Amino acid sequence: FEVGIENQDDILLKNEVAKFVFKFKDNANEKIVNKEKLEEILSNGEKRALYILQILFEIEAQKNTNKPILLIFDDIVDSFDYRNKHAVVEYLDDIRENINFKIIIMTHNFDFYRAIARFGASKFMIHRNDEREIVFGRGEYTNEFIKSLKKNDENIKKNFITLIPFVRNILEYTKNEKDKEYLLLTSCLHMKDDTKNIKVEQALNVLKNYIQEYQANINKDDNLLDFIYGTCDEIANTNNINPIELQNKIVLSIGIRLKAEEFMLSKVNLQNEITRNQTRNLYNLTKEQNAINDKQDFIIRKVLAITSDNIHINSFMYEPILDTSIEHLVKLYRDIKEI
């Protein structure tokens, strides 16, 4: 099909918005369909593309008006829309050169955020505080997030814990699920037979094997599970906790899931080892065996809803964790501790 403009003269002479028509051709036959009719049968993705096309025409029409114009883009790119994402980034880079355009870009897409951060403009991460005020924090994580975790700074313990799922993902893709190092890191993130006996040094040695020049000045003789829980306690008890810092959210998510699994294992009669989707399958067992009460069930379901996707280190999985408030995670951690 071809896209045409029904009111081309009016766009040029009267600055009207473009009215699109679609010409569908099948051999010698041609049928013209207007935008309103077409929207009745388009998918959401196709409607989005059509909407963007309409906006682009309107922006282009305003380029030469010599009037100051504020452009606000709100979640213009979907998480998995790689092809259009790069096109949108390049277009935004182009139009920002126009001195008449002032641009505000809002997004939940972490990968898109990092892509446009190279423009060098002001960057903010926004959260809502306890008084329900909207707070603009300094934009972080514009460079490689994983590289920042290699630093021996005040976040060293949180950085170390955050790197565990990242390296586990590397092993998952490069080796197999029977690999000893993969199994060790799995036991750091899920309650297995050996989880309570793992030392910090064991996990640290695996991280060093896959992260170049990684050093962490932490107590290697500590029990890893106690180390994770202790770090979660420090985060939960911090005054004026950083609401944006990803490490806080990832570490709390890991601690919450471990606490939940530890609790459920104490309640069920487990006949066979669970090899996949452990938290979910443990919850299913508690229901089958009628092992938990309604209050406990409510808390565990919140754990399943929040933490599952937050412990994978890639661009899209940042989106749910960025949207989850730190206060919500702290409360859930305290709830699961007291369950």
Name the predicted role of every residue range.
Residues 1, 127-339:
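Acidic, Mg2+-coordinating catalytic modules of nucleic-acid enzymes
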Residues 112-123:
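Short regulatory helix/loop adjacent to the ATP-binding pocket of P-loop NTPases
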Residues 44-71, 86-94:
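GG-anchored amphipathic helix commonly corresponding to the ABC/SMC/Rad50 NBD signature/C-loop
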Residues 1-42, 61-64:
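Extended helical coiled-coil dimerization/tether regions that scaffold
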Residues 77-78, 92-93, 97:
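Aromatic- and carboxylate-enriched substrate-binding clefts and catalytic-loop regions
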Residues 31-41, 58, 66-75, 155-162:
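Glycine- and acidic
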Residues 74-82:
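Walker B catalytic acidic pair
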Residues 101-108:
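Structural recognition of the conserved hydrophobic beta-strand(s) that form the central parallel beta-sheet
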